[in-house]
Amino acid sequence: MAAKAGSDQPWLADAAAELAGQSGAVVDVVSADGVDLEAFSTVPRSEAAEPAERAATAIAERIRAAGVKATEHTLSGPVVRSVLLFAEEHDADVIVCGGSTRGAVARRLLGDQSIQLIRRSRRPVLVVTPPR
């Protein structure tokens, strides 16, 4: 399950917990720092990793509170590439991610990571939209 760094996504945690609870799955919650090349970053990797670590921990704790086994992982590197690599290395059954909360113009200008996951993944991707 992909957690967005610096974001609070309880609705995503609840959906993942429900899915895992029904199937008996274990959830690996991953969040990436988004730093591509540390040498060119204006922020030290340790600072960039903090929001990712907080997001993964918060979601994993919420999933565990629902009675589902969950482990959090903070990854280094671009989000989409890091999530896809983790999914391949750990033979994930499905990648669960949140739908974009950005407006249409922002998605067009900045991109949409859930769309990129769908396009690039060889595994099923479940996109959970935020409640209205």
Regions found by a protein language model. Name each.
Residues 1-11, 120-132:
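Intrinsically disordered or low-complexity boundary/linker segments at protein termini
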